[in-house]
Amino acid sequence: MISAHVWADAQRLWDFQQMGHEPHPCSVAIGLGSHDLGVAETTAELYHRGMAPVIVFTGATSRTTHERMPRGEAEHYRERAVELGVPERAILVEPNARNTGENIRLSRALLEDLGMPVTSVLLVSKPYEERRAYATARKLWPNVEWVCVSTSMTLPDYVKSIGDARLVIDMLVGAQQRLMVYPRQGFMIKQEIPEPIMTAYEHLRGHGFTSRLVPETAEQT
């Protein structure tokens, strides 16, 4: 049973991860691979709204996706977007990235190899990773405008969609930790962390929501 205090702290981290960017037309949309097909669905919706003429889906597989997405996250995203009416010619697949940094670097390399001019990117991620994705993208590709979006959901609705409240809170704590650790390792830009967010993070760690934490000397994940 998860207490009301834990839920309140998780909500603070959830809200902090939301960047609050308003989608507008960009040169390209990049959908970051994961277990969550909602990223592909949101990217497809944005395409149909005219927010980007080209989509890059990026991602190999991970320990959480190798069984349900055996052809790779990017390929499963592509298939879902095509099911939703996105033309195959509008989709590029980057199948090798295994972390957020590689998502950005390899997508950039793919677009540059194709000679596609990029001045702005619609970056589509899971709801609890908007800020992490933004900080990584700004570090690795600083000379373009980044507009971060995700599926519009409340925390309770997202937990219901995943079916595992503890896992979602673990992932929130892990995303928050990376915002603090990775800038020191050169993986992200530094962002100010408000005191209430730090307090919520420490409370959740103290309650054992630690399965998605990384050692502070670990490579990027």
Curated annotation (Swiss-Prot):
Keywords recorded for this protein, A-Z: DNA-binding
Transmembrane segments: none
Alphabetical list of Pfam families matching this protein: DUF218 (PF02698)
Claim: DNA-binding is one of the keywords in the record: yes
InterPro entries referenced in this protein's UniProt entry, alphabetically: Cell_Envelope_Assoc, DUF218, Rossmann-like_a/b/a_fold
A GO molecular function held by the record: DNA binding
DNA-binding segment(s): 77-96
GO cellular component: plasma membrane
Similarity section: To E.coli YdcF.
Protein task: The imp locus inhibits the extrachromosomal maintenance of the streptomyces plasmid SLP1. May function as a transcriptional activator.
This protein's name: Uncharacterized protein SCO4629
